[in-house]
């Protein structure tokens, strides 16, 4: 490449970076002045976007933007038309890079994966990634430079859409890696540092209801988590349909969180009416189960908000007859009045159709103290919304185990100025060094967010 070409290329990169920086800055400025219908009602309250102003779209996203959505903000069903507008994925443009708050740095930890989905950190620091569509679980390991994977190996293959991953028992020396396939839970014998499964998979739970196509409403992801004492295992199972068509009964063992003993015995339904808890996690201090949930489609742009919530034992969360309390789904008029007053209102409502996926509590020590104990969640992005939302990682403030009810954009920038999408966050995990690791099945990358203070 000649000198002139190098100068031209450099200018293009610089211009691209400036364009994306300008878009991010404008988004932050617009966040207090949403456009169109979003400008109705009170937009801010103490620096937090509220009411219709909190609904917004990707143009109001930027690191540090805070939102609070309540049931009082919900529009009526069908107030806007239900649209089919999935993202048009494009290669990452020159100069495009995820945006994070000041003092943080983003590095591409690994590239070229096959649609990386959920990710979890092993006690020794290895990162286990589900490549669900390829039927694999992969192991990534940093080298001397923490910002780049030096080891990239397939731990197990020929699995059936693996998603959830968990190490058992808790502590520095687990004996098993559990993997949740779409129709079963299996486990592999494991010792710290294993890059390959040392034995074939042992089936622990053989009969989880599986199948379904996500776009058509059927949900195939299964996450798993263990109680703090290791005596129980939770498995999340999404609904088979987007809107259940039978008025009085519900799909068997779907739209539930199931509970088992670690050996697969002792089955019971822990909580129900949770349409699709893609991500679950146990709070490290309180021991409470939390879930990151995708709500239903077809009722308009701002119905029904996704949510992140503590999950109450025996609790009913509404699906398919109600949503977010005693709000009846109009597609099930008059159905199940006996359950109306039992519906639990979730803790934190997220912009509708954001597709909230994996969640994780921050237990590291690298980030500033104000992040300790807060939750992070990956928002994969909308398809059933005229104005795109999601395509980001959010932070959910937690005070002594109790969510405050608001959330904050933490990692944005995955949408181009033209509205095309180049990245879709799926998984989040806290690395052993305290950095935050994010999987992105839009660009097939794994990102590392570290705090530098600069």
Go through each PLM region and give its residues.
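Bacterial N-terminal signal peptides
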Residues: 10-22
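Asp-box/WD-like beta-propeller blade repeats and closely related beta-sheet repeat scaffolds
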Residues: 150-152, 156-168, 175, 181-229, ...
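Beta-propeller domain segments
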Residues: 42-101, 174, 186, 221, ...
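Surface loop/turn motifs at the tips and blade-to-blade linkers of beta-strand repeat domains
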Residues: 108-113, 154-160, 204-209, 213-216, ...
């Amino acid at each position: 490449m000649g000198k002139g070409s190098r100068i031209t290329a450099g200018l293009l990169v610089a211009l691209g970076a400036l364009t994306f920086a300008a878009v991010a800055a404008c988004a932050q400025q617009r966040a207090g002045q949403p456009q169109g219908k979003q400008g109705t009602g009170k937009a801010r309250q103490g620096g937090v976007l509220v009411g219709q102003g909190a609904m917004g779209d990707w143009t109001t996203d930027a690191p540090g933007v805070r939102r609070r959505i309540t049931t009082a903000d919900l529009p009526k069903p069908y107030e806007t038309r239900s649209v089919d507008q999935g993202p048009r994925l494009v290669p990452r443009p020159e100069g495009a890079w995820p945006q994070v708050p000041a003092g943080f740095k983003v590095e591409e930890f690994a590239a070229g994966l096959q649609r990386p989905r959920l990710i979890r950190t092993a006690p020794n620091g290895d990162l286990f990634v589900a490549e669900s569509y390829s039927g694999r679980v992969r192991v990534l390991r940093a080298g001397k430079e923490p910002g780049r994977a030096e080891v990239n190996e397939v731990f197990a293959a020929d699995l059936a859409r693996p998603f959830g991953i968990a190490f058992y028992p808790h502590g520095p020396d687990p004996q098993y890696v559990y993997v949740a396939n779409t129709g079963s839970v299996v486990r592999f014998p494991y010792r710290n540092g294993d890059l390959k499964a040392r034995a074939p998979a042992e089936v622990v739970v053989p009969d989880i209801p599986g199948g379904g196509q996500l776009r058509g409403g059927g949900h195939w992801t299964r996450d798993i988590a263990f109680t703090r004492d290791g005596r129980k295992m939770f498995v999340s199972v999404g609904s088979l349909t987007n809107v259940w068509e039978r008025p009085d009964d519900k799909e068997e063992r779907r739209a539930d969180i199931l509970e088992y003993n670690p050996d697969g015995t002792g089955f019971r339904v822990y909580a129900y009416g949770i349409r699709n808890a893609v991500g679950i996690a146990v709070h490290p201090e309180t021991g409470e189960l939390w879930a990151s949930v995708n709500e239903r489609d077809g009722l308009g742009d701002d119905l029904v908000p996704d949510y992140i919530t503590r999950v109450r034992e025996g609790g009913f969360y509404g699906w398919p007859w109600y949503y977010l309390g005693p709000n009846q789904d109009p597609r099930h008029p008059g159905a199940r009045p006996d359950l109306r007053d039992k519906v639990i209102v979730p803790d934190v409502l997220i912009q509708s159709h954001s597709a909230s996926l994996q969640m994780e509590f921050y237990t590291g020590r690298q980030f500033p103290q104000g992040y300790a104990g807060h939750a992070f969640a990956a928002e994969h992005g909308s398809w059933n919304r005229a104005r795109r939302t999601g395509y980001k990682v959010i932070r959910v403030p937690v005070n002594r185990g109790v969510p405050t009810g608001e959330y904050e954009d933490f990692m944005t920038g995955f949408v181009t100025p033209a509205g095309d999408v180049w990245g879709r966050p799926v998984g989040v995990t806290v690395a052993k060094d305290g950095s935050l690791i994010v999987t992105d099945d839009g660009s097939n990358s794994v990102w590392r967010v570290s705090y530098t203070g600069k």
